C-alpha cells in the first residue's frame, strides 16, 4: 500500500513476482519528454492583449531567453515590434545596475496605462516605460511607516487576492480570487463566514456582514458570474443554511497529532444546503433578500444585472435539473417574479455545469432588453432570444448540430457570434459562426481548418483572432475580419523539437456503439517508433460519465491526454473515446444515460476495442488495460466485471462506486427513496464478485466523496479473496497535484508495464 508516498507492505497488494519488462533508457527518455509536452511545440497560438484605441493588439512570442513582443494592426494585419529590444534592455541595465536575464524581452505581460505608456513587472519591481523615449521609471514601494495597509505593494493592492470559502457541492473549502468592482475601488471576497470588501486604494478591509456562522454562512461567487452591479455600488451574495446536512468525518493524517476534520456533504436523497440570494450595498444598509419563491432543493445562478440596475436576473434549477425558472428581482425591494421557465422529461443540463461549470445557457443582451437562451428542446442545443417578459422574440439557430457557447452579441451591427460543432463529417470540431440577432437568418461559418477553434473577438467586434488545432494538426493562428475573411496569418506551430524527440501522428477512427448504428469517435496515440508490423498492447483511458467528454480533440491536449501521449511511447497503443451518454452531441446521444446507468457504457467501450482490433492487426487484444479517474475509475472497474474477455488490467483511481454516496447521481437516477432498483443497478460495489484480471485501486484520505467507497470495494474484494493493489495518498483529495501526481503516474505506468508487457 502507498500512504503519502511511503511504500509499505499490505496484505491487499497483489504479488509482484512478475517484474516489469525492461524499458530501454532511450524509450524512457522519450516518455519523460512527453510528460512535459508543451516545450516540444513552439508557437502557433496567439493570446492577444488589446492596445488602447482598439486599432491594434500585442502578443508575446518565444521563451524566456529570446522572447519578443509584437504589435499587430487590425485593419491591415501589419506586424511590427512592440518594443525595441536593444533600447529596452539598455534602459533596464542602466536602471537595475545589471543586465536582465536572457537575450530578448525579459517579461511576458504588459499593461498599457496610456497609448504610449505601459507597465510591467521584473525582479519584484513594477516599472513604467515610455514607448516614445524609452524613459524607464521604477514605481516606488511604500515604506513601513506608511502603515500596514500601505506596506503592501501597489501591485498587490491592485490585484485580486485569494480567499477560502465553503463549497458544499465539492466537499470542504475551495480557493477563490476576489472580484474587482467595475469602478475599480473594491475587491469582493470572504473572511471566515462573512462578506469582506478590500479597498484597492489603501488595502483596508470593510466587513459587509458580521452575522455569519458555521451553520448559517455567507459566500460570494467570484469566478462563474458577475456579482457586481454595473456601477460597482452593489453586489449579490449568497447565504446558506447548512443545518441538517450530513457531516463527513476526516483527519489531517500528517500532523504530529492527528487533527480531525469535518465536511458538510449531501448524499443522494439527503439534505441540501438551503441557499438564498441577497443584494448588499458597498458601504451601508442591510442585505436585501431576493424573493425567489421556495429555494429549498434548488440551485441558484445569477444571470446578470440590467444596465440600469433595476433588476437582477436569476436562474433557479430544481434539485434534479429537470426544470429551470428565470426570475427577475428588484434589487432595492427584493420582490421577484418568474418570467420564463423550461422543463425536460430527462434533464436540462449536466450536474457539473450547474454546480461547478461556467458554460451557462444564457447571455444577457448588452442593452438590457432581454437575453439569449440555449436549449436542447428540439433535440439539439440551439439559441433562442427572449425579452424581459419571457416572450420568445426569435429562434436564432437550428439544425442537426449543437451550439456550445456565445462569444459576443454585437447589437450595433445585429449579429450574434457563437461556437458550434456544425461539421457533420467531424462532429467534435468546434467553429465560429454568426447569425442575425433578429432571427430568420442562416448561420454563417467564419472559421476554417479542421479541429477545435478558440477565438478572441476584437473589442469592437469587427475582427477576431482564431487559433485552432486537431489531434494530428499542430496549432495555427490567423486574424480574420468579422465576416470570416482572413487578414493575415499570425503563427504556425513548429514541431521540430517534437520530431527530434520522436513522434508518430495520432490517429482518429470512427466505430459503432453497441446499438449498431451510433457513430463513436476514437483518438489513438501510437509509439514514437511505431511499426505497423508489430503487435502492441492496448491501454484505454475513459471517463464515460454524463458530465464531460474526454476524447482528445486538440494537438497539445492537457490533462490525462498528456500522460496518455507519454505512455504510448513505452510501447502501447493508447485509445480514448466518448461513448453514448456523454455530452457534446445530440440530446438523444446524451439521454441514453437517463435511468440506464451501468447498462450500456462498457458494451460501447468494449465493442469499440473489438472493432478497432479487427481493423488494426497491430493491436494485441490479448493485452488490453484500462484506466480512469472519478467516474472513469467507476467504469474502469466495471470493465473488469462486465467485459473481462476484453480488459485484463485496470487502474481504478479516486472512484465513486455507490451512487447513494453522492448527490451527483440524482440528475440521472432520480432520488433513491423512489428509485432503489436504479441505484442498485448503478452500484459498482455489487459487481465485486464478477471482477477478473489485475486491479489497482487508488484513493486519497482527504477525498471525502470517494475514499470510503474505495475502502468498501477493497474490503469486499478481500472478503472474496481477490488479490489487488491498493494505493492511498494521505495529503491529497479528489485531484492529485505536484509530486503526488507524478508518483501516481509512475505507479500506474509500472502497473501496466508489469501486466501488459509492452
Feature names for model-found ranges:
Residues 1, 178-180, 208, 226-228, ...:
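Generic low-polarity alpha-helical segments
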Residues 1-11:
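Bacterial N-terminal signal peptides
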Residues 17-475, 479-480:
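Beta-propeller folds
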Amino acid at each position: 500500500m502507498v500512504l503519502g508516498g511511503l511504500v509499505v507492505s499490505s496484505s491487499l497488494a497483489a504479488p509482484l513476482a512478475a517484474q516489469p519488462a525492461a524499458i530501454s533508457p532511450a524509450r524512457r527518455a522519450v516518455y519523460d519528454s512527453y510528460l512535459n509536452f508543451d516545450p516540444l511545440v513552439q508557437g502557433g497560438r496567439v493570446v492577444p492583449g488589446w492596445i488602447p484605441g482598439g486599432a491594434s493588439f500585442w502578443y508575446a512570442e518565444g521563451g524566456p531567453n529570446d522572447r519578443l513582443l509584437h504589435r499587430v494592426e487590425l485593419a491591415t494585419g501589419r506586424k511590427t515590434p512592440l518594443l525595441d529590444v536593444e533600447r529596452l534592455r539598455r534602459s533596464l541595465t542602466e536602471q537595475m545596475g545589471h543586465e536582465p536575464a536572457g537575450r530578448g524581452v525579459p517579461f511576458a505581460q504588459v499593461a498599457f496605462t496610456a497609448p504610449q505608456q505601459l507597465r510591467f513587472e521584473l525582479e519584484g519591481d513594477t516599472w513604467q516605460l515610455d514607448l516614445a523615449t524609452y524613459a524607464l521609471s521604477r514605481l516606488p514601494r511604500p515604506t513601513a511607516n506608511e502603515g500596514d495597509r500601505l506596506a503592501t505593494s501597489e501591485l498587490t493592492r491592485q490585484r485580486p487576492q485569494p480567499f477560502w470559502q465553503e463549497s458544499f457541492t465539492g466537499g470542504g473549502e475551495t480557493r477563490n480570487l476576489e472580484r474587482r468592482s467595475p469602478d475599480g475601488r473594491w475587491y469582493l471576497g470572504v473572511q471566515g463566514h462573512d462578506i469582506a470588501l478590500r479597498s484597492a486604494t489603501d488595502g483596508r478591509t470593510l466587513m459587509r456582514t458580521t452575522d455569519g456562522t458555521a451553520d448559517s454562512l455567507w459566500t460570494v461567487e467570484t469566478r462563474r458570474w458577475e456579482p457586481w452591479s454595473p456601477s460597482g455600488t452593489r453586489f449579490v451574495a449568497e447565504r446558506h443554511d447548512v443545518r441538517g446536512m450530513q457531516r463527513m468525518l476526516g483527519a489531517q493524517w500528517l500532523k504530529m497529532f492527528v487533527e480531525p476534520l469535518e465536511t458538510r456533504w449531501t448524499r443522494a436523497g439527503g439534505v441540501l444546503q438551503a441557499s438564498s440570494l441577497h443584494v448588499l450595498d458597498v458601504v451601508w444598509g442591510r442585505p436585501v433578500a431576493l424573493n425567489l419563491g421556495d429555494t429549498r432543493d434548488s440551485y441558484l445562478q445569477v444571470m446578470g444585472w440590467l444596465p440600469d440596475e433595476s433588476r437582477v436576473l436569476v436562474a433557479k434549477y430544481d434539485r434534479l435539473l429537470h426544470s429551470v425558472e428565470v426570475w427577475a428581482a428588484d434589487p432595492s425591494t427584493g420582490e421577484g417574479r418568474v418570467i420564463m421557465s423550461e422543463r425536460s422529461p430527462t434533464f436540462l443540463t449536466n450536474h457539473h455545469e450547474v454546480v461547478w461549470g461556467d458554460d451557462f445557457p444564457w447571455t444577457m443582451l448588452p442593452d438590457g432588453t432581454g437575453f439569449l437562451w440555449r436549449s436542447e428542446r428540439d433535440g439539439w442545443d440551439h439559441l433562442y432570444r427572449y425579452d424581459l417578459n419571457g416572450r420568445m422574440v426569435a429562434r436564432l439557430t437550428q439544425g442537426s448540430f449543437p451550439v456550445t457557447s456565445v462569444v459576443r452579441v454585437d447589437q450595433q451591427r445585429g449579429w450574434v457570434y457563437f461556437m458550434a460543432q456544425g461539421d457533420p463529417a467531424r462532429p467534435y470540431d468546434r467553429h465560429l459562426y454568426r447569425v442575425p440577432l433578429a432571427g430568420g437568418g442562416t448561420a454563417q461559418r467564419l472559421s476554417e481548418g479542421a479541429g477545435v477553434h478558440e477565438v478572441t473577438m476584437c473589442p469592437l467586434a469587427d475582427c477576431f483572432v482564431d487559433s485552432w488545432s486537431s489531434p494530428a494538426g499542430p496549432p495555427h493562428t490567423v486574424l480574420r475580419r468579422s465576416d470570416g475573411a482572413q487578414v493575415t496569418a499570425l503563427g504556425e506551430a513548429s514541431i521540430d523539437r517534437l520530431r527530434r524527440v520522436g513522434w508518430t501522428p495520432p490517429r482518429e477512427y470512427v466505430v459503432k456503439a453497441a446499438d449498431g448504428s451510433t457513430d463513436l469517435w476514437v483518438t489513438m496515440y501510437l509509439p514514437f517508433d511505431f511499426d505497423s508490423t508489430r503487435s502492441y498492447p492496448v491501454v484505454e483511458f475513459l471517463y464515460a460519465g454524463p458530465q464531460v467528454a474526454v476524447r482528445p480533440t486538440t494537438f497539445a491536449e492537457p490533462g490525462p491526454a498528456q500522460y496518455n501521449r507519454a505512455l504510448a511511447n513505452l510501447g502501447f497503443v493508447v485509445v480514448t473515446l466518448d461513448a453514448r451518454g456523454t455530452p457534446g452531441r445530440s440530446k438523444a446521444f446524451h439521454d441514453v444515460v437517463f435511468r440506464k446507468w451501468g447498462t450500456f457504457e462498457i458494451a460501447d467501450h468494449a465493442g469499440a476495442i473489438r472493432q478497432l482490433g479487427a481493423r488494426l492487426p497491430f493491436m494485441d487484444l490479448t493485452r488490453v488495460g484500462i484506466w480512469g479517474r472519478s467516474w472513469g475509475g467507476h467504469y474502469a472497474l466495471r470493465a473488469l466485471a462486465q467485459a473481462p474477455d476484453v480488459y485484463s488490467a485496470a487502474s481504478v483511481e479516486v472512484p465513486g462506486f455507490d451512487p447513494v454516496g453522492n448527490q451527483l447521481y440524482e440528475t440521472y437516477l432520480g432520488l433513491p427513496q423512489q428509485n432503489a432498483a436504479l441505484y442498485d443497478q448503478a452500484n459498482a460495489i455489487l459487481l465485486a464478485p464478477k471482477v477478473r484480471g489485475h486491479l489497482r485501486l487508488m484513493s486519497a484520505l482527504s477525498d471525502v466523496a470517494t475514499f470510503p467507497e474505495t475502502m468498501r470495494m477493497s474490503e469486499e474484494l478481500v472478503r472474496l479473496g481477490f488479490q489487488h493493489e491498493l494505493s492511498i495518498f494521505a495529503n491529497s483529495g479528489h485531484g492529485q497535484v505536484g509530486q503526488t501526481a507524478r508518483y501516481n503516474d509512475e505507479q500506474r505506468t509500472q502497473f501496466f508495464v508489469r501486466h501488459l508487457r509492452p
